[in-house]
């Protein structure tokens, strides 16, 4: 498990989130033959999000939500981890740098960058890597897994990347005045009822860069960086959570 996990109580809370993800079969039972639980596999890492094996800070300044971790073939081939030279990750790292984050090259674990990455669904698809993600899966995973993750991390900034990531973020943060379609929402931001800053951006994958061109994505992430740069420090909260004096 990545560091920055906090006190014993925090570790227990995080462990409960991991156990819930591994045990969940809601969408598998609703859509047999189209989606698989990663918890079926003995090599499934003890994480909430498989993306956090790159960026998984437990007191992040920013939580970013993408689409999925690929398909069952990708998951099994890489034993629950990302492969090097993943275009989505390479693009995302460049965008995070534009936002002012100094992050390791993926998939090397970065224990210091205050970023947590997750996806709109935590299971993996059967079929092709570009197979559709069903709206029902996103809604179910948002309610059962993303909502408690947000409650645990308490990120001051949350970013929905692409259509699925945006639908999940919009649902959990209840920014119902925001456009539902990512094509209308991308590039804009809102303040949730709990004062979380919510941003909608294009997905950093190859198709996402076609849908929202690279210069626009860079501009979007620079705006996110400006918002992050004026956040109040989280040191006091981090010290309290970790039990340090």
Give the predicted meaning of each segment.
Residues 181-190:
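Alpha-helical scaffolding within the catalytic cores
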Residues 4, 30, 236-238:
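Intrinsic disorder/low-complexity segments enriched in polar/small residues
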Residues 2-10, 243-245:
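Class I S-adenosyl-L-methionine
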């Amino acid at each position: 498990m990545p560091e920055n996990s906090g006190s014993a109580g925090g570790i227990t809370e995080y462990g409960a989130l991991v156990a819930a993800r591994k045990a969940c079969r809601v969408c598998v039972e609703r859509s047999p033959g189209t989606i698989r639980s990663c918890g079926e596999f003995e090599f499934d890492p003890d994480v909430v999000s498989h993306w956090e094996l790159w960026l998984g800070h437990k007191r992040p300044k920013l939580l970013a939500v993408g689409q999925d971790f690929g398909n069952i073939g990708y998951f099994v081939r890489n034993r629950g981890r990302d492969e090097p030279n993943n275009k989505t990750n390479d693009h995302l790292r460049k965008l995070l740098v534009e936002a002012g984050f100094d992050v390791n090259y993926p998939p090397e674990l970065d224990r210091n960058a205050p970023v947590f990455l997750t996806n709109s669904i935590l299971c993996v698809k059967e079929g092709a890597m570009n197979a559709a993600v069903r709206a029902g899966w996103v809604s179910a995973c948002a309610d059962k897994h993303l909502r408690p993750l947000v409650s645990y991390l308490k990120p001051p900034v949350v970013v929905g990347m692409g259509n699925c990531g945006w639908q999940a973020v919009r649902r959990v943060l209840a920014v119902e005045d925001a456009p539902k379609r990512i094509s209308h929402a991308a590039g804009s931001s809102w303040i949730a009822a709990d004062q979380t800053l919510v941003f909608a951006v294009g997905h950093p994958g190859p198709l996402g860069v076609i849908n929202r061109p690279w210069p626009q994505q860079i501009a979007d992430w620079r705006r996110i960086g400006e918002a992050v740069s004026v956040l109040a420090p989280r040191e006091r909260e981090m010290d309290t959570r970790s039990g340090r004096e």
